[in-house]
Amino acid sequence: MLLNSKRGQVSIEMLILILAVLLSGTIFAAHMTKNTVSHDEISDVKKQTFKSFLGSVEGSTASSLPEKISEEDTSPEEDTIPEEDTSPEEDTIPEEDTIPEEDTSTEIPIGKNVKIYNLPIKEEKQNWFLDILNTALDRISAILDGFFSLFGLDLFNNDEIIPNILVKDFEGNRIPLSFDWERLSYTTDWFYAKEIEFTGDSSAKYSKLDLFRIFPIYSYSDTTFRITDLSYNLTYDVPPSTAKKTITITSNIPEGIKCKVTYKIGGILTGDYYTLEIDEKTSSNKYNNVNIAFE
């Protein structure tokens, strides 16, 4: 009996011990699992915070770098652009503005290379001629007047015709100038012109030709090319009110060409030529030239 009771007690104690061991194992296992889970969570949190920190650091550095680059790029552009743009503008603008302002002469400038001259007609009973005086170019022509004009002939030697000459009559109509022009009588082929306009420029080409010549005996020392007789007799062909008006000469022909206005008093054979007084200063040789030079 005693033996049986002892065996039963030992079995009960062994059972209790086994249960205690199992219980402690489960408790230990449960505790270990709790520690591992918390450790994993902590590591995940650390990883996420580290990644976010790295992202913030990269974002801050990326945002700061383009600002520095843009500042370094724009600073030299802002320095070079106004220097290159403003320097030529400041040099060219005053030069273009001061050129027309300096023209303070008696002539009336209507353009950069164009001037207008008003030639007053003071008297009525006179013959008015407009001549181009050769100064710098080669010999333009030689005109014979006086005795040979009685036969209705003039001499033209080595004529160099100047193109782009517009002659207008008193009604504003254009009068064409013929290159093979010859005067067959004293009263024909002369134009009653009110305005003579030169439209050539500095690079104008001159057509040179020899016209029909008769009696090549005499020529003036001052070679001229007579464009037009403004009036053979103003009192006969032009009303006195019109004859008293001014003659406008607009010119932009090359430098070296000048003009003069002469009138004749007397008959065909004995008449003398005089220069129209454009201003008070007249030269001793009776040539009061009006400069219509290209500038």
UniProtKB/Swiss-Prot annotation:
Position of sequence motif QXSXEXXXL: 9-17
Annotated segments matching region Disordered: 58-105
Compartments where found: Secreted; Cell surface; Fimbrium
Alphabetically ordered keywords of this record: Fimbrium, Secreted
Keyword Secreted found: yes
Entry note about domains: Contains an amino terminal motif QXSXEXXXL, which is part of a class III signal sequence.
Name this polypeptide is given: Probable minor pilin MMP0601
Organism: Methanococcus maripaludis (strain DSM 14266 / JCM 13030 / NBRC 101832 / S2 / LL)
Source species taxonomy: Archaea, Methanobacteriati, Methanobacteriota, Methanomada group, Methanococci
